[in-house]
Amino acid sequence: MKTIGLIGGMSWESTTSYYQIINETIKKELGGLHSAKILLYSVDFVEIEHYQAVGDWEKSGQLLADIAQRLEQAGADFIVICTNTMHKVAPQIQKKITIPILHIAQATAQALLVDGIQKVGLLGTKYTMTQDFYKEKLIESGLEVLIPDQVGITEVNRIIYDELCLGNIKESSKQTYLAVIDDLKKAGAEAVILGCTEIGLLVKQFDTDLPLYDTTVIHAEKAAEWGVNK
């Protein structure tokens, strides 16, 4: 079994989901008392959020690259960045290590294509929805990507940082998300990517008839697969 290097804490709530899903998947795959071999480095999220807010991606990338190096030195066989947004600096991190990074957007694209999805809506932080680092991975895989209008982008992003990252789950915010999802459906989306590891804490598949692809679940299950097979 491979040792999984997790970079978590962005936020810690979603990182606990990674730990649980990876171990549940390993147990299902191998049975018995098997559990995942995991090294976890959990950051102080306030540092990362500050660098995001001021646009200092170089600094945040260096911080995570240093962590990835420590995980590699400690015996990790591959790296899992437990957040969508910070995959913006994945290339910078990869340059500093010799082990692979399991990219969350590539794992998600594979899951969509297996299910025959061609046009997909994307929800996430404003960085994930509007910048190319994430959407390009989806487009390169042959997917057409739709995002909310500017009002939707602002509200989706606000709820992530002001509520979900603080562990606050509000019914009013769920309804806001469901309205945005409905707009994406009307625009032709065949499914929606929950492209922030916190969104799955708020919106569940039973809340809508449009297929939802929770990147936390997809990424964590793929990490378990790599841990067993790669």
Task: Tell me the role of every PLM-derived stretch.
Residues M1-K230:
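Non-catalytic structural scaffold of enzyme domains
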